[in-house]
Amino acid sequence: LLLGAVAGSEVCYDRLGCFSDDSPWAGIVERPLKVLPWSPSTINTRFLLYTNESPNNYQIVTADSSTIRSSNFRTDRKTRFIIHGYIDKGEENWLANMCEALLQVESVNCICVDWKGGSRALYTQATQNIRVVGAEVAYFVDALQSQLGYSPSNVHIIGHSLGSHVAGEAGRRTNGNIGRITGLDPAEPCFQGTPELVRLDPSDAQFVDVIHTDGAPIIPNLGFGMSQTVGHLDFFPNGGVEMPGCQKNIISQIVDINGIWEGTRDFAACNHLRSYKYYIDSILNPTGFAGFSCSSYNTFSSNNCFPCASGGCPQMGHYADRFSGKTNELFQQFYLNTGDASNFSRWRYQIAVTLSGRKVTGHVLVSLYGSGGTSKQYEIYKGSLQPGTSYVNQIDSDVDVGDIEKVKFIWYNNIINPTLPKVGASSIQVTRNDGRVFNFCSQDTVREDILLTLTPC
């Protein structure tokens, strides 16, 4: 009899209702500890409003309509909430930077949600505290609707790490009526594999998009993010596990250009933090993060998922909601590569080079020239160069070349060859991610390290 079900305990708060430690909130395999969330007054959730009228200084608003009415909040704008994760705070630079970027491209109520009173705790405690924060956000959204007639479909919640699951809880409590939730590397421990009630899932909003950047297992790799698909669209940049630029050595990372605190954060959780950096970059680069529908990153890297399907490719990040098929299915997976430093956007091209001239061993490189700019030289092939053979590769250019007007070909082999062989490209075909094809031709051959320009055939 003693082994019977133990009645769970619960805590209740007047505005927000009751929180129990019953299953699935606690006492399940993924969350064995029976822990209750802290009180709303301890967590002290705050809403920091940035607007086009005051882009650099926030106004503190609450779910009381008088504070909203006396602020720069406008009901004819979308409202985007940005929610930080574990140990973080609402005044951290990245949240304000995200608002700043949003205010450059749109008229918006941008609200940074600060819950540092609940995020700076033992991790298992923080995972319970998010339930109260989610309830606070839902209460705020409900107040906007009941007091100002503001529709939840105009609300977009962007959450990083634990903040993704705060967004999920707020969405669940508003019955999935919120317009959009974006999960930026949703936290894995205590959430991966749990029932949908506990974590972010596609029923939490009309549209849910997710960026996965740190999907390695928490043990032993310390991957903080979920590898599980939890949205309508799930993006896996660079495969979703190891982000380029995150493998720097410890000292260079900590004494980073952004100062000790940013550097230390980047060292401890570089992959995990990349998700919000990609999102911020995407706001100002509407075409720079095309995601390709694919079964896996290996398949994508083997050049098997190009170009975009007839409906186009969704853009990872801010403009994911422009994708026509966004809610056709759940858990649609998309892959792409990004840059490794400040400018993360990339544009993918397929290049097919048909060689002419002598048979040699060497490297073939091509650069693209177009209405939007000029790309670097990208290696298309290295090995035995056979005239009449076509070599195909895909590149990720840091420049959106636009309509391609000409291409330049160069080859080298670094072996002294007294016969001075000449190699050329009789044709180069470039395919853009929208499927548009550009063809270029040349009759000439060149010695190594000499540029050959090909013009439209």
Curated annotation (Swiss-Prot):
Residues annotated as catalytic: S161, D185, H272
Biological process annotations from GO: lipid catabolic process
Record's keyword annotation contains Hydrolase: yes
A single cellular component GO annotation: extracellular space
GO MF, one annotated term: metal ion binding
Reactions catalysed, as given in the entry: a triacylglycerol + H2O = a diacylglycerol + a fatty acid + H(+); 1,2,3-tributanoylglycerol + H2O = dibutanoylglycerol + butanoate + H(+); 1,2,3-tri-(9Z-octadecenoyl)-glycerol + H2O = di-(9Z)-octadecenoylglycerol + (9Z)-octadecenoate + H(+); all-trans-retinyl hexadecanoate + H2O = all-trans-retinol + hexadecanoate + H(+)
Keywords from the named record: Calcium, Disulfide bond, Glycoprotein, Hydrolase, Lipid degradation, Lipid metabolism, Metal-binding, Secreted, Signal
Main subcellular localisation: secreted
Record comment: activity regulation: Inhibited by bile salts, is reactivated by (pro)colipase/CLPS.
Signal peptide (residue range): 1-7
Intrachain disulfide bonds: C12-C18, C99-C110, C246-C270, C294-C305, C308-C313, C441-C457
Residues binding Ca(2+), per UniProt: E196, R199, D201, D204
Domain PLAT span(s) in chain numbering: 347-457
InterPro entries hit by this protein: AB_hydrolase_fold (IPR029058), Lipase (IPR013818), Lipase_LIPH (IPR016272), Lipase_N (IPR033906), Lipase_panc (IPR002331), PLAT/LH2_dom (IPR001024), PLAT/LH2_dom_sf (IPR036392), TAG_lipase (IPR000734)
Glycosylation sites: N343
Keyword DNA-binding: no
Its job: Plays an important role in fat metabolism. It preferentially splits the esters of long-chain fatty acids at positions 1 and 3, producing mainly 2-monoacylglycerol and free fatty acids, and shows considerably higher activity against insoluble emulsified substrates than against soluble ones.
Family that this chain belongs to: Belongs to the AB hydrolase superfamily. Lipase family.
Subunit structure: Forms a 1:1 stoichiometric complex with (pro)colipase/CLPS.
This protein's name: Pancreatic triacylglycerol lipase
Origin species: Myocastor coypus (Coypu)
Name of the encoding gene: PNLIP
